[in-house]
């Protein structure tokens, strides 16, 4: 008997096995159409015209006008396990991701102990993640001074690419690189089709600023001016054009860097750029004194800058939107002192990215296909998961409501799933949404309820890359990692 004979999701429960999904709004590439999606053995076997699938006994999920798209892939998540699991761990991070419609994350190489800067450390990370993940997980490696001999072995072990800092990272075990280090690393990566991610801020020669009131956000903002990003982005653009190694600028904050980015792309540089939900949602003018949970690096800038980022995103100069989910324990935020200059920088938004983005994007000329492109397709291409997670091929689907809702809600701590929450940041920012997640044909999450045994249905992705030629293959490690 079909699970549902009429549109709706109210009676579907986690654990239900679905064989047909029917929707009037299925996103495939740049099109939206009415379809019946046929699922067999955890894969989509065919996509038929709406209402054409009439097989007796099919377990049909008819979602009516709800949007069906490939799950969101977030390539910028700091999980911090092992070593700093009290900041964030695989279990809580991946549960939060699932609650936000994210079906895969890519773990950043720093803030865990050890960092992912060697093959040995990478395997330590894999062990820590074993049987803890509620969504698929891939991993970035790290580039630090003098670890160039580890880069190709880490690629062969399965990292999705690499991340480096051009400025102090905040943790001693992940030092920033020099220009000389970058030449060495990029020489190693030539011909691999790997990607190098840059935290793009550079220390610049500037007069020592007057010491202002450290509880005022403007004091912190003045300490990280646009010029630091501009200088770093110019360096990345130059190196990208010189070596023809894929380069990616993470968490772009300053819209003043966009001219450099546009010119580099026009010149043929293999350069991509991301910005974050907090840069698109927050403005420095509205950050109160002492509210250090708003601190991140690069900083949230002014309203005009925010609107320029939105415009660049609409024009295609920025390629994707990510969370840069980077929690820490409350003591490191120095909430009592309210000291922006000394507090740890990082914002938690992992489970709220989709409603944050769509609530603002739909008023600025963005379409539903843009949502899929910016939050799923382009992020998959960046980290190589497009190889194994082609949209609507594997059943890692998100079903959600894009309608205009009149009910806004305040972001209370109780709805946060991440280990450390900052509910005040997202108060009144978005409208309530409901969604379902389908993993390999099995309904995992429905309106907040989760399937408890989801841990056995997932992959840790290790993406093999050979130096000459590059030959990426499918993920080779099941979630239970039996041979590690």
Swiss-Prot record:
It catalyses: (S)-allantoin + H2O = allantoate + H(+). Zn(2+) 1 binds at residues 76, 78, 163, 324. Its cofactor is Zn(2+). GO terms for cellular component: mitochondrion. Its EC number is 3.5.2.5. The keyword Zinc applies. Binds 2 Zn(2+) ions per subunit. Carboxylation allows a single lysine to coordinate two zinc ions. Gene3D superfamilies: Metal-dependent hydrolases (3.20.20.140). It holds the Pfam family Amidohydro_1. It is found in: Mitochondrion. It is an enzyme of class 3 (hydrolase). Its main location: mitochondrion. Keywords: Hydrolase, Metal-binding, Mitochondrion, Transit peptide, Zinc. One of its GO terms (molecular function) is cobalt ion binding. This is Allantoinase, mitochondrial. Homotetramer. Zn(2+) 2 binds at residues 163, 199, 251. One of its GO terms (biological process) is purine nucleobase catabolic process. Belongs to the metallo-dependent hydrolases superfamily. Allantoinase family. Pathway: Nitrogen metabolism; (S)-allantoin degradation; allantoate from (S)-allantoin: step 1/1. Liver and kidney. The modification N6-carboxylysine is found at residue 163. The keyword Hydrolase applies.
């Amino acid at each position: 008997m079909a699970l549902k004979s009429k549109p709706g999701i109210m009676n579907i429960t986690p654990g239900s096995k679905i064989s047909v999904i029917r929707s009037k709004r299925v996103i495939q590439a740049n099109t939206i159409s009415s379809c019946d999606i046929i699922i067999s053995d955890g894969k989509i076997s065919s996509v038929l015209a709406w209402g054409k699938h009439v097989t007796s006994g099919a377990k049909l999920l008819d979602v009516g006008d709800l949007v069906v798209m490939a799950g969101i892939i977030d390539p910028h998540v700091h999980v911090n396990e092992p070593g700093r699991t009290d900041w964030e761990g695989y279990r809580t991070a991946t549960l939060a991701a699932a609650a936000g419609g994210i079906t895969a994350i890519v773990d950043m190489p720093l803030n865990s102990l050890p960092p992912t800067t060697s093959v040995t450390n990478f395997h330590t990370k894999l062990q820590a993640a074993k049987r803890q993940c509620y969504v698929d997980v891939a991993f970035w490696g790290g580039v630090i001074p003098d670890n160039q001999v580890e880069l190709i072995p880490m690629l062969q072990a399965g990292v999705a690419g690499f991340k480096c800092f051009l400025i102090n990272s905040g943790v001693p075990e992940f030092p920033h690189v020099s220009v000389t280090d970058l030449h060495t690393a990029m020489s190693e990566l030539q011909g691999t089709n790997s990607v190098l991610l840059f935290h793009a801020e550079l220390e610049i020669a500037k007069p020592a600023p007057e010491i202002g009131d450290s509880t005022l956000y403007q004091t912190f903002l003045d300490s990280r001016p646009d010029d630091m990003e501009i200088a770093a982005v110019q360096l990345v653009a130059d190196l990208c054009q010189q070596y023809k190694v894929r380069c990616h600028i993470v968490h772009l904050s300053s819209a003043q860097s966009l001219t450099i980015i546009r010119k580099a792309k026009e010149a043929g540089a293999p350069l991509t750029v991301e910005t974050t939900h907090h840069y698109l949602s927050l403005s420095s003018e509205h950050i109160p004194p002492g509210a250090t949970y708003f601190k991140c690096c690069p900083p949230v800038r002014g309203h005009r800058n925010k609107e320029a980022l939105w415009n660049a995103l609409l024009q295609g100069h920025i390629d994707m939107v990510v969370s840069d989910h980077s929690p820490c324990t409350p003591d490191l935020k120095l909430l009592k002192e309210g000291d922006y200059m000394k507090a740890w920088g990082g914002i938690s938004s992992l489970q709220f990215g989709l409603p944050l983005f769509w609530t603002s994007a739909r008023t600025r000329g963005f379409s539903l296909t843009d949502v899929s492109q910016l939050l799923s397709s382009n992020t998959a291409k960046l980290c190589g998961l497009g190889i194994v997670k082609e949209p609507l091929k594997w059943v890692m689907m998100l079903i959600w409501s894009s309608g205009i809702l009149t009910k806004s809600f305040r972001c209370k701590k109780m709805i946060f799933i991440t280990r450390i929450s900052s509910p005040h940041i997202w108060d009144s920012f978005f409208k309530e949404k409901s969604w379902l997640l389908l993993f390999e044909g099995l309904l995992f999450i429905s309106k907040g309820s989760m399937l408890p045994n989801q841990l056995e249905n997932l992959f840790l992705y290790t993406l093999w890359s050979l130096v000459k030629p590059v030959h990426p293959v499918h993920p080779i490690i099941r979630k239970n990692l039996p041979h590690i």
